[in-house]
């Protein structure tokens, strides 16, 4: 989660917290006021995106965040930017029987067929139904991470950063390309 915006951009991928850091840097470069909202989510919503030993060893409560922007004097909660439309479309194609709530593959929503993922002066969500603890809003990711971070051993953090996140991103890429 402590990966810089420039590293996320250079890597070409990230997860919710690192993409949020990049998004905030871009928003601020455009003089759009923003803040980060921290949470934990239940790991069950990651099943499918995380598989095998990565899923088995993931903590039950996974640190998560979304970005809030102040646009035209109103705050909006933006979460759906963390998953691309191609990936979401592939998930919908793989789960044609799902007409209501969906939880898995990095998604936890009330209405899987009618997602609100495009910003048009509205909130956008993609994992909000998996939230199990709310940490509130912070002006910058560093402030949030000083108070709250992923509860995980040093060994597991190292393994996730150097192996797990790459396996998870590879799995997401496979789903997207099917």
Describe the function of each predicted region.
Residues 41-178:
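His-Asp-centered catalytic microenvironments across diverse enzyme cores
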Residues 1-58, 62:
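Active-site neighborhood of thiol-dependent amide/isopeptide-bond enzymes
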């Amino acid at each position: 989660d402590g990966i810089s915006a420039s590293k996320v951009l250079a890597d070409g991928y990230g997860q919710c917290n690192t993409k949020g850091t990049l998004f905030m840097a871009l928003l601020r470069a455009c003089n759009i006021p923003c803040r980060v909202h921290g949470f934990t989510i239940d790991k069950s919503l990651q099943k499918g995106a995380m598989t095998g030993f990565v899923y088995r060893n993931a903590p039950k409560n996974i640190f998560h965040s979304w970005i809030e922007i102040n646009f035209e004097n109103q705050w909006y909660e933006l979460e759906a930017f963390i998953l691309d439309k191609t990936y979401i479309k592939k998930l919908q194609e793989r789960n044609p029987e799902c007409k209501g709530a969906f939880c898995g593959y990095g998604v936890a929503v009330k209405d899987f067929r009618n997602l609100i993922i495009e910003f048009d002066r509205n909130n956008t969500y993609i994992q909000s139904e998996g939230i199990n603890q709310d940490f509130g809003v912070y002006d910058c990711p560093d402030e949030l991470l000083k108070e709250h971070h992923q509860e995980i051993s040093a060994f597991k953090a190292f393994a996730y950063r150097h192996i797990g996140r790459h396996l998870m991103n590879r799995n997401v890429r496979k789903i997207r390309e099917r």
